[in-house]
Curated annotation (Swiss-Prot):
This is Probable E3 ubiquitin-protein ligase XBOS31. GO terms for biological process: protein ubiquitination. The keyword Iron does not apply. ANK repeats lie at residues 46-75, 79-108, 113-142, 160-189, 197-227. It is an enzyme of class 2 (transferase). Its EC number is 2.3.2.27. A zinc finger (RING-type) spans 317-366. Pathway: Protein modification; protein ubiquitination.
């Protein structure tokens, strides 16, 4: 008789887990109505509950029903993994959001490597899940703010000293790298033993051969000269792995990339549309640098006469006279293109010890820039445009000399020894890019 009851219970458990896997809400409801205790049963080996199984398979209705029945949102499997971790691994964003809304703890660590749900989302490259978790962690009244603080959570380490940024870079998850950097991940933090002791995200991206991750990391100020515990820079790692294109970008002899000016307070306060314009200008400038490094020649990208004429109908930038004005200094109302605005913001480098950066000044009126917005278009600005051009004509001599001085940055040649052998073919320094708009920054020093 006892054997019969045991078989019946095992069958009910199997049916429950099967219904959770397939999303059969009606079968699940019937089973739980007959025996509510089934909701707490777990599989024999992995100790997955129906909640884990629903989260892993993206069964949102089943998940919601189980949570509404007072299911334990942070129930642990054999490896101490929560349903939130499982959903983040599988990229089931809707389930992640529902679990977070149900009070799932983002600070739970699993047992294999002491990783959080943030680690798992970054490792598997699920940027939407990552965004949802970071959004929940950023809540002012949430448990992260009360105990850890958001900045510490973004840079949380596993037992091998790897942060979510390290995992994303090692597995070439460029969208996750971008998101984590934007949320405050420390770009040059070293690992303890993960990958190779002392590796930064740049070392790990070089090991993976991910050009996209390397672009993102360099644009956020990753140090090409930082060494791991064996004394290797990221360039040496890329060369050893045979990723020659990555090595060309990482070569310390090559021109430095333009770095996102995150230390500036008003950069952190940019509205989404203004931030998107500046980010696009940054990536375009660094892609031009990349082309020069990889192809060894200047690439002149200009539109035809028709395109130039259509741009001229808009308010042209009075610094480069090439692009339409897209950014406006809020205090004084002067306008520039996104590329020139970025050149001004990136001209001065922050103090590496304090990361302090003095705010730049408007190149036209010398007002300290404290806020940037997207420029408002107005077709009837002929008079103001003429006045602005006449005002900027006094800068033309300085612009020419500044362009020359900026273009010489990074010029020359050099050789770097990697593992005892010199690599000369990749060590020639190309001209510094961004010279067409770098003159804008020189105005700030006059």
């Amino acid at each position: 008789m006892g054997h019969g009851l045991s078989c019946s219970r095992d069958t009910d458990e199997y049916d429950l887990f099967r219904a959770a896997q397939l999303g059969d809400i009606h079968a699940l409801s019937a089973l739980l109505a007959a025996d509510p205790a089934l909701a707490r049963r777990a599989t024999v080996y992995d100790r997955f509950t129906a909640l884990h199984i629903a989260a892993a398979n993206g069964r949102l209705q089943v998940l919601s029903m189980l949570l509404d029945r007072d299911g334990d949102v942070d129930v642990l499997s054999r490896k101490k993994q929560t349903p939130l971790m499982v959903a983040a691994m599988r990229g089931n964003t809707e389930c992640v959001v529902r679990l977070l809304r149900g009070g799932a703890n983002v600070l739970t660590f699993d047992s294999p490597r002491a990783r959080t749900c943030l680690h798992h989302a970054a490792y598997y490259g699920h940027a939407e899940c990552l965004q949802a978790i970071l959004g929940a962690a950023a809540q002012a009244q949430g448990p992260v703010a009360a105990s850890w603080g958001f900045a510490r959570f973004v840079n949380v380490r596993d037992e091998r000293g790897a942060t979510p940024l390290h995992l994303a870079a090692r597995h070439a998850r460029a969208s996750c790298v971008r998101l984590l950097l934007d949320k405050g991940a420390i770009v040059s933090a070293p690992t303890a033993v993960y990958g190779f002791p002392g590796s930064t995200a740049l070392h790990l991206a070089a090991r993976a051969g991910s050009m996209e991750c390397i672009r993102e990391l360099l644009a956020w100020g990753a140090d090409r000269l930082q060494r791991d515990s064996a004394g290797r820079i990221a360039y040496a790692v890329a060369m050893r792995r045979g990723h020659r294109a990555c090595a060309a970008l990482l070569n310390p002899a090559a021109a430095e990339p333009i770095v996102w000016p995150s230390p500036l307070k008003f950069i952190g306060e940019l509205e989404a549309d203004a931030k998107a314009l500046l980010e696009a200008a940054l990536m375009e400038a660094n892609r031009e640098r990349e082309k020069r490094i990889l192809h060894g020649s200047d690439i002149n990208i200009k539109g035809g006469d028709e395109e130039e004429e259509s741009e001229d109908e808009e308010e042209a930038c009075n610094i480069c006279f090439e692009q339409a004005c897209s950014m406006e200094v809020k205090e004084c109302g002067h306008q520039m293109c996104a590329a020139c605005t970025l050149a001004i913001c990136c001209h001065s480098k922050p103090n590496p010890k304090t990361l302090l950066l003095h705010p730049p000044a408007c190149p036209f009126c010398r007002t300290t820039i404290s806020r940037l917005v997207v420029a408002t278009t107005n077709s009837n600005k002929t008079n103001s445009r003429r006045r602005s051009r006449s005002r900027s004509s006094s800068f033309k001599g300085g612009l020419s000399s500044a362009m020359g001085s900026f273009s010489r940055i990074g010029r020359g040649s050099g050789r770097l020894v990697v593992d005892g052998s010199s690599v000369g073919e990749l060590a020639d320094k190309p001209d510094h890019d961004f010279s067409s708009v770098a003159a804008a920054a020189a105005i700030c020093d006059t």
